[in-house]
Amino acid sequence: MKIRSQVGMVLNLDKCIGCHTCSVTCKNVWTSREGVEYAWFNNVETKPGQGFPTDWENQEKYKGGWIRKINGKLQPRMGNRAMLLGKIFANPHLPGIDDYYEPFDFDYQNLHTAPEGSKSQPIARPRSLITGERMAKIEKGPNWEDDLGGEFDKLAKDKNFDNIQKAMYSQFENTFMMYLPRLCEHCLNPACVATCPSGAIYKREEDGIVLIDQDKCRGWRMCITGCPYKKIYFNWKSGKSEKCIFCYPRIEAGQPTVCSETCVGRIRYLGVLLYDADAIERAASTENEKDLYQRQLDVFLDPNDPKVIEQAIKDGIPLSVIEAAQQSPVYKMAMEWKLALPLHPEYRTLPMVWYVPPLSPIQSAADAGELGSNGILPDVESLRIPVQYLANLLTAGDTKPILRALKRMLAMRHYKRAETVDGKVDTRALEEVGLTEAQAQEMYRYLAIANYEDRFVVPSSHRELAREAFPEKNGCGFTFGDGCHGSDTKFNLFNSRRIDAIDVTSKTEPHP
């Protein structure tokens, strides 16, 4: 057993209001520069819908994630090394700019320079940020399907409608929607790492954050196809790939990510999980896709177990990280209460950004008296959002974990409503779903109140264990350019503008 730690995230979809604050703040901090105008490290999608980029969940089209071969071994869906090499100069599974959107701005200067007395109202026409040319029509945007914007024929192409009679949901009275904030999953078994020909992508040992080395990246873009969540973007200015960095400078300082800090709905939770690195391959190679969720749970370790603590210390896990894992809200939601579920575990990447399924539209329908009940709780299988749809999204089609999570949330609400409104303690609903009163009270505190100190339990990094970064900063500078690879050629395979790098190598004493 080899114990490692990972900073994970849980998003409570039951409270997401779709305000896009997380997307805007992330955009302003990380991708408000030339070359990545179209890139959104964090975006909020409305489901049902095809998402951003279009149809990103269709792995028959994009070939992302892993597949299990007949011999039980894993292989990138793109193919083996020889197949990857054969596609290196022409990747047919790469999303194009039209699958995202052509970034644009408006000719606001035209409003200022329009002559007085003009017979027509001056307008600010859209202009492409890539070509600089005027655009006749804006065809798409990052939230083009926001709030079910668009006809149902396009929304019905959502892959999560598989095995569902989706025709009935085209009728107004059966319409449903939910918000799905998405960011890089920082997987335990990342396919992007395996498909990068340059070996530029790596997973940090201390916190599990997946990063791209901008010095090593050569812009092959195989990682974009390899990532099943399509959360890696190509910077056409620098010729490099970029992705969500989980705000690691903030994480190292013990602070939450920008998207978590600015979330007005308090839906995001950050915490440490301890896991067995030796069990990753066995879990990801599980034959039945519906068992992948449980196999990933088996990878996580109990931070309160004395044997786990002893082994973690031997494996170099600091005590502060172990203590943070014992108070982790992510561990409580994923392991103890089993409310949080992984996004598309069938991709076999073992994602580490999990989601609590939405309950609000279901509960409102139950309050209206339109639904039957199953014992104390409403019959969740007959409620507004199809359980099978949520299962296709979060548990590879297995409805049992979805039903358990929804019933436990309903039971907690039933218990607290009886306590606060009726002034009595009614534990029948809790007993029905296997919860204690103490667990229900704690769930209420974390889900409803969601205090800052409960949502974010992030240990600061141990800088005494890190190598001094000043020589690297002095020699190269922390830039998004070509880095210090020492190239002096002007040839560019992808016909994009490159930033000339200055070859400066710092001389430092060897680290003891």
UniProtKB/Swiss-Prot annotation:
Its cofactor is [4Fe-4S] cluster; [3Fe-4S] cluster. [4Fe-4S] cluster 1 binds at residues 16, 19, 22, 263. InterPro entries: 4Fe4S_Fe-S-bd (IPR017896), Nitr_red_bet_C (IPR029263), Nitr_red_bet_C_sf (IPR038262), NO3_Rdtase_bsu (IPR006547). GO terms for molecular function: 3 iron, 4 sulfur cluster binding; 4 iron, 4 sulfur cluster binding; electron transfer activity; metal ion binding; nitrate reductase (quinone) activity. Gene3D superfamilies: 3.30.70.20, nitrate reductase domain like. It is an enzyme of class 1 (oxidoreductase). It is a peripheral membrane protein. Keywords: 3Fe-4S, 4Fe-4S, Cell membrane, Electron transport, Iron, Iron-sulfur, Membrane, Metal-binding, Nitrate assimilation, Oxidoreductase, Repeat, Transport. GO terms for cellular component: nitrate reductase complex; plasma membrane. Pfam families: Fer4_11, Nitr_red_bet_C. [4Fe-4S] cluster 2 binds at residues 26, 244, 247, 259. It catalyses: nitrate + a quinol = a quinone + nitrite + H2O. Residues 7-35, 175-206, 208-237 form the 4Fe-4S ferredoxin-type domain. It is found in: Cell membrane. [3Fe-4S] cluster binds at residues 196, 217, 223. The nitrate reductase enzyme complex allows S.flexneri to use nitrate as an electron acceptor during anaerobic growth. The beta chain is an electron transfer unit containing four cysteine clusters involved in the formation of iron-sulfur centers. Electrons are transferred from the gamma chain to the molybdenum cofactor of the alpha subunit. Dimer of heterotrimers each composed of an alpha, a beta and a gamma chain. Alpha and beta are catalytic chains; gamma chains are involved in binding the enzyme complex to the cytoplasmic membrane. PANTHER family: NITRATE REDUCTASE BETA SUBUNIT, RESPIRATORY NITRATE REDUCTASE 1 BETA CHAIN. This is Respiratory nitrate reductase 1 beta chain.
